[in-house]
Amino acid sequence: ERADSGFRSCASVQTSLVMWPIHALGSPEQKARWLPRLRSGEALGCFALTEPLSGSDPASLQTRAVPDGTSWRLTGYKRWATNGNKAEVAVVWAKAGGDDARSIRGFLVERGQFQARPIPGKMSLRASDSAELILDGAVGEPLPGATGLGAALKCLNEARYGIAWGAVGAATACFAAARDYVKERKQFGKPLGAFQLVQEKLARMYTDIGLAQLSCVQLARLKERSALTPVQVSFAKRAHVAMALEAARSARDLLGANGITLAYPPIRHLLNLETVKTYEGTHDVHTLVLGKHITGLDAFA
């Protein structure tokens, strides 16, 4: 993500939201067929949960799956499917036989069964392939372990872990650009970096990035021991993305008018991070996750 959040989004979806559910929730046949191709990059996959009227409330999704002999037919409309225009397979979430969160199931839908259309006019994540998917009686193969909304949320938790790391990379790129600029740019007869207020901003960015790096290391240690909890991942995703956004804004400020041009990376990272703040659970949603953990009281509804 130090290069661009769009690149990390592509990799994050491929690994956490496509390969992981096939690995953890799929059948032996599904694993054998798809994981080698996805792992090598021969095939791309996408994850289709969000809909035009279902974002932070995924339980309200409207896509339906009905049995048709030995297969299932899916009908619905998905939006913001990263990699969707080039995906060979989509992990699609639909309601099967009911209208509550327990009826949600995950399906593998192959290219040719869905129509993908690019989402135009983006000012953020321009390097990311964002698509809307149209399913009109699409043939879907159920993932045996992907039952209930909780299965979809487990996938998202894997992706959020990667976002917590990636946001630190974006912040580091912004810090490096600002540091190099203020060492060379002169005003009032000396480098900008020689002014106290400039050094204060750099010191704050440096400290915040360092703390987030230490947090990532602790997350990894917990994950290696299978001790990492969804609340800890929400904590890190929320805190690290907010930190990276502030770093991007500070870096843009230190670059002055030059900071609004694409000659320097902070403004691009700033726009990208506005999207990262929203996807895989918005900043406010993760605030409520932490609030429930702290108080034991559910404030979602």
Locate the predicted segments by residue.
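Short beta-alpha junctions and helix-cap segments that line functional grooves
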Residues: 34, 61, 77-79, 118-121
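Conserved hydrophobic/aromatic beta-strand scaffold that supports enzyme active sites
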Residues: 46, 62-64, 89-93, 106-108, ...
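A short, Trp-centered hydrophobic/proline-enriched beta-strand micro-motif
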Residues: 41-49
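Short Gly/Pro-enriched turn/cap motifs at secondary-structure boundaries
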Residues: 53-56, 80-83, 95-98, 122-129
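Flexible, small-/acidic-enriched active-site or ligand-binding loops
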Residues: 60, 111-138, 142
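Alpha-helical interface subdomain recognition
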Residues: 1-2, 10-13, 25-30, 37, ...
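A short core secondary-structure module
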Residues: 71, 75-115
